[in-house]
């Protein structure tokens, strides 16, 4: 599910993806993504991998149909995700499917004295509220390193990647809090 229209078939093929077994779906709304996953899980016994890029940029239907006032659709996406994940968690597990959700960090903008204190402790928030935090079996925080020494270059000196810091925020499979650096 792609909400950014940024998929490159040539890159996928060079990366080893079998395009004959890939189903590309434009993520038009959060509801559409969740309903499509439910349909696909019910349509086959094959083991499936769902990748959603990205939760942050996929709007809810009320966001599309509503006005530009952010207050008018506050917490709608979080409520949809909470309901969707409670509905899909068991079918995903029963089919041994994988559901990978990419999300972005947003700056936590305080709107009152108490909120300012909270924002000092947690300066970032993720779109979709806490629903996904509870549903995730594994939550990984990736941050790019900025120094030139972290750049990956080819034989001509062109930058082709960079080093990434990875921190395990939550894990039902092992110990949370572990971290490592690797190159992409």
Report residues per predicted region.
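Conserved inter-motif catalytic segment of the P-loop NTP-binding fold
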Residues: 1-83
């Amino acid at each position: 599910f792609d909400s950014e229209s940024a998929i490159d078939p040539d890159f996928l093929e060079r990366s080893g993806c079998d395009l004959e077994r890939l189903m590309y779906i434009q993520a038009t709304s959060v509801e559409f993504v969740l309903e499509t996953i439910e349909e696909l899980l019910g349509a086959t016994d094959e083991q499936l991998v769902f990748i959603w890029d990205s939760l942050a940029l996929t709007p809810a239907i009320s966001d599309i149909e509503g006005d530009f006032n952010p207050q008018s659709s506050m917490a709608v996406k979080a409520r949809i995700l909470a309901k969707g994940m409670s509905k899909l968690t068991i079918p995903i597990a029963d089919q041994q499917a994988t559901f990978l959700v990419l999300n972005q960090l947003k700056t936590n903008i305080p709107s009152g004295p108490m909120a300012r204190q909270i924002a000092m402790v947690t300066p970032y928030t993720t779109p979709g509220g806490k629903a996904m935090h509870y549903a995730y079996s594994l939550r990984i925080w990736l941050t790019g390193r900025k120094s030139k020494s972290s750049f990956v270059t080819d034989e001509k000196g062109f930058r082709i990647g960079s080093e990434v810091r990875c921190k395990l925020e939550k894990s039902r499979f092992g110990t949370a809090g572990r971290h490592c650096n690797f190159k992409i």
